[in-house]
A protein has these predicted regions:
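Sec/Tat signal peptide C-region and signal peptidase I cleavage site
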Residues: 2-6
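Short coil turns and loop connectors of transmembrane beta-barrels in diderm outer membranes
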Residues: 7-9, 58-61, 72, 102-103, ...
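Transmembrane beta-strands of outer-membrane beta-barrel proteins
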Residues: 11-19, 64-66, 106, 156-158, ...
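Residues on the lipid-exposed face of transmembrane beta-strands in outer-membrane beta-barrel proteins
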Residues: 15, 19, 44, 48, ...
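Acidic/polar N-terminal loop/beta-strand segments that form early-domain functional surfaces
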Residues: 16-22, 51, 56-60, 65-71, ...
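Surface-exposed coil loops of outer-membrane beta-barrel proteins
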Residues: 20-45, 74-93, 101-182, 187-192, ...
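Outer-membrane beta-barrel pore domains
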Residues: 37-40, 74-77, 82-87, 184-190, ...
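Surface-exposed extracellular loop regions of Gram-negative outer-membrane beta-barrel proteins
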Residues: 52-73, 149-151, 202, 206-216
Length: 307
């Protein structure tokens, strides 16, 4: 029998669908159409994003999440799969968790990255297109992590995982380590995978009831014997003008050295380049529908392909 205070386990299914139209203002829109070097929302004309279906089971002590994606955005997000399973390229997240105590949770399986301000699901981002910092950071991990509530708004996460974005199994025998220290919604993140490492700060501040400022900054170094690296920072000011409409800007500066991650695509004689991208997005909400008109301008230091 259940006590009156006990809650029955809950199984829920949720999800989103996104579609879009994209056109270049000063570049071809035919078979020679180009797009920014960031991830997702790169296809011309009327295009598909993805369908996202999430099944979750929440018990008092344990639960699971099965997060499936279908469509071009989902395919791009799980670019390293299928590695073994024929259906591996639809699994965005697949993990189980155990609430060891009120302050400790263990999670094992495939989960989206803890680094960065933006996420794979467009419904959870203010801007529809994505930043360079998000695009060239990790997307997902498979491993085990421990989350600790340290009290007084402090939190700590530690993780041991397969190499970055190898989500179905580990073909290399190498392992990555991750750390996150959080305080009152501000997070300092660290990831080391196969000699490469990334340090990331993600946070935000409510400057008033209607004005929010998000912040993301990161530095990535490829490996001990490779000088390639990138760094960048982005600001996300957002203002709510009414209950149904908000306006947001993403201003990002991104720089690569020794070829970096290949994001910009054109470099000087030393292999260096930088890009400044400004994205203005409106967000209009009608019930469960979000409509996001967006204008994006990317300007690179070299003669790279950009819009």
């Amino acid at each position: 029998t259940l006590n009156a205070q006990d809650e029955a386990p809950k199984l829920s299914v949720s999800g989103t669908v996104d579609v879009y139209y994209r056109a270049n203002l000063s570049a071809p829109n035919d078979e020679d159409a180009i797009a920014p070097g960031s991830s997702f929302a790169q296809l011309p004309g009327f295009s598909l994003g993805m369908a996202n279906v999430i099944a979750s089971y929440e018990g008092e002590k344990a639960g699971f999440v099965a997060d499936l994606v279908f469509g071009p955005r989902g395919t791009d997000a799980i670019f390293a799969s299928p590695m073994y399973s024929g259906s591996g390229n639809i699994v965005n997240q697949l993990y189980a968790y155990w609430n060891v105590s009120e302050s400790v949770t263990l999670t094992m399986g495939n989960f989206n990255t803890f680094l960065g301000y933006e996420v794979i699901s467009p419904a959870a981002n203010f801007n529809y297109s994505t930043s360079y910092l998000f695009s060239y950071g990790p997307f997902s991990h498979t491993g085990i992590k421990a989350d600790f509530d340290l009290g007084s708004d402090w939190s700590l996460m530690t993780a041991v995982m397969n190499p970055t974005d190898l989500t179905e199994f580990n073909p290399t025998g190498d392992y990555a380590v991750g750390l996150q220290l959080g305080y009152a919604g501000q997070y300092l993140n660290y990831l080391n995978s196969q000699g490469a490492y990334e340090v990331d700060f993600t946070g935000g501040f409510d400057l008033s009831e209607s004005f929010f400022l998000g912040v993301n900054a990161a530095y990535f170094d490829a490996s001990d014997d490779n000088d390639a690296s990138f760094a960048g920072a982005a600001l996300y000011p957002q203002i709510a003008t009414s209950e149904s409409f908000s306006l947001g800007l993403r201003a990002e500066y991104f720089v690569e050295t020794e070829g970096g991650a290949g994001a910009i695509g054109a470099y000087d004689v030393d292999g260096d380049a930088d890009i400044f991208a400004v994205t203005l997005t409106g967000s209009y909400t009608v019930g469960n529908l979000m409509i996001k008109p967006e204008l994006r301008l990317d300007s690179a230091s070299e003669e790279a392909t950009f819009i």
